[in-house]
Amino acid sequence: MPTDYYEILGVSRDAGKEDIKRAYRRLARKYHPDVNKEPGAEEHFKEINRAYEILSEPETRNRYDRFGEAGVSGGAAGFDPDNMGGFADIFETIFSGFGGMGGQATARRRTGPTRGEDLRLDFRLKFREAVFGGEKEIRIRHLETCQTCKGSGARPGTSSRTCTTCSGTGQVRRATRTPFGTFAQVSVCPTCDGAGEVIEEKCDVCGGSGRRQETKKLKITIPAGVDNGMKLRVAREGDAGLKGGPPGDLFVYLTVETDAEFQREGNDIKSDITISYIQAILGCTIKVNTVDGQEDLTIPAGTQPNTVLILENKGVPKLGNPVSRGDHRITVKISIPTRVTGEERELLEKLAKVRGETVGKGGIEGFLGNIFHK
C-alpha cells in the first residue's frame, strides 16, 4: 500500500485542515464500495480512510511528517470510539445518504420534542370561486395528540423509562478495528427504535404512539385572485408533534376548474361575443356577461372582426390587493349570414350601389365579406 498519504488524498504537504477534509469527502464518495463496483475501488477506499485518519489529526500528522509511516503505525492502539471527534462526524455526514460501513443508515438523536409532519390536501375550485375567493369547509384526516395518555404513549398512571441499551441517546455506536484503521458505525437503537425511551405499559387507545388518527372539519379562507396550482398554508393543522413538539402545517393545493364562457390570462379575463353585421356596421350597445354579472358594452360603428374591446377593472382581483383588478378583454366575432331574404337582398343591393360597388360572383355574401376586410 502506498504510504504517501498526501498523494492519496491529492493535496499538498502544506494543505490546511479544510482542504484535507474536502479532498476526503470527494474521494470517499467516489470510491465507497456501495457506489463504486470497479476492481480495486474498495482497497483504494481503505487507503483514503487511512490517509484522512492520519492527516486530519495534528498530532498524528506531525509524527507522519517527521517519521513517515513508522511514526504512525501504532496510532490506532489507544483508540476510543467515544473520542473520534471530527472523523466520526464527517464520516456520518458523507455516508448518510447510503448507509454506514455496515450497510445501515446512520442515526441522528431524536429523543426530544419533534415537529409533526406537514399534510397535503388537493382542493378544486370553480372559476368564479377562484376569482372572488371566500370561505370553504374542508375535511381532513390527521394525527392528533392522544387525549388519554396526553401524548406520552404510556398507560395512564405509568411512565416510560430511559432505554438502557443506548442510555437515552436513541442510537448505538460500534467501533470496528481493521488493518487499515478503526471505524465507527452508528445506527438506530434496536431496543427503543431511536426514541431513547422504552414504554413498558403502552396506552390502550393509541397503542403507545401518543397520537390518534382523527377526522376534522375546518373552515379555510380562499383569497380572491388565486390561480390554478397555487397552495395555501394552514398553520398547525398538520399532524400533531411528538413529545410536546409543535404540529405540522396543512398545505391546500388548488385546482381551478375551466369555465365554458371565460378564460383567464394573468389577472385579465377573456371571452368572445358574436354580433350581427348590421350591429358591426352601425355600432350599438349590448349586454355582455362578466364575472360580476351583465354589463353594458359599446360597439363602435365599423367594428371589424376579432376586434378586442376592454371593460376595465372587471377582471381578476390582484392577489393580496383585491381592490385592484385586471380587465375583461372581449373579442368581437361578426356573424355574416349565408342566406338573406328577398327584402334584405334588395336593401343590400341598394347599399352596394350607393357605395359604388358591384355585387360580384360571391353575391351579397361576398359583398359583406368585402366590407369587413377593408
UniProtKB/Swiss-Prot annotation:
SUPFAM superfamilies: Chaperone J-domain, DnaJ/Hsp40 cysteine-rich domain, HSP40/DnaJ peptide-binding domain. It comes from Microcystis aeruginosa (strain NIES-843 / IAM M-2473). GO terms for cellular component: cytoplasm. It is found in: Cytoplasm. It holds the Pfam family DnaJ_C. Zn(2+) 2 binds at C163, C166, C189, C192. Binds 2 Zn(2+) ions per monomer. One of its GO terms (biological process) is protein refolding. A zinc finger (CR-type) spans 133-215. Keywords: Chaperone, Cytoplasm, DNA replication, Metal-binding, Repeat, Stress response, Zinc, Zinc-finger. CDD domains: DnaJ (cd06257), DnaJ_C (cd10747), DnaJ_zf (cd10719). Transmembrane segments: none annotated. It comes from the Bacteria. One of its GO terms (molecular function) is ATP binding. The J domain is necessary and sufficient to stimulate DnaK ATPase activity. Zinc center 1 plays an important role in the autonomous, DnaK-independent chaperone activity of DnaJ. Zinc center 2 is essential for interaction with DnaK and for DnaJ activity. Participates actively in the response to hyperosmotic and heat shock by preventing the aggregation of stress-denatured proteins and by disaggregating proteins, also in an autonomous, DnaK-independent fashion. Unfolded proteins bind initially to DnaJ; upon interaction with the DnaJ-bound protein, DnaK hydrolyzes its bound ATP, resulting in the formation of a stable complex. GrpE releases ADP from DnaK; ATP binding to DnaK triggers the release of the substrate protein, thus completing the reaction cycle. CXXCXGXG motif repeats lie at residues 146-153, 163-170, 189-196, 203-210. Homodimer. Belongs to the DnaJ family. Its main location: cytoplasm. This is Chaperone protein DnaJ. Its cofactor is Zn(2+). Residues 4-68 form the J domain.
